[in-house]
Amino acid sequence: VLLDIELDVAQGEFVALMGPSGSGKSTLLNLIAGIDKPSSGTIEIGGVDIARLSEGELADWRANNVGFIFQFYNLLPVLSAFDNVELPLLLTGLGARQRHERVAQVLQLVGLSDRADHYPSELSGGQQQRVAIARALVTDPQLIVADEPTGDLDRTTGEEVLSLLDQLVHELGKTIVMVTHDPKAAARAGRMVHLEKGVLVDESPAH
């Protein structure tokens, strides 16, 4: 349960949500991403109060405006890296040529052009997370929500993933909201927001 949360995130900002288990981090992330609806209040993103959208409108809004990155990658094991990244585009009505060009672009961006035909089982954890980041980017969303994106990675690989997220913010102008338990990961963001028992207790610059 979240209580009287007031949080402003600027376009092109990298925000880390921190707090103990059960503090409301994932709940807040789900609300921001339009997965859950609040019982009261507003969630305004890009001038749209997504709390007022119908389920169908919300699904369309998510598909066009939000990219998701998860701790355990959530890649389909029977699909290649290329096909995993292409999945969100199958809902957009783009033709095959446009889809393939876009997938090639984002795989190049995350440094995996040479792994496009590999299956998840043939990729390291860091490579799988890069595929997941490419999938999050392929529809060119303004907002990216990341739930413990380095939680299943070793320190060095985690740093590489965080550097990539930083690149998305500073070079592409993406907005990233990231849940993490790791203070070092949170320090890579521009701002840290601390939650306890559903209450926003502190905000501070990460640097």
Protein language model features and the residues they cover:
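ABC family nucleotide-binding domain
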Residues: 1-195
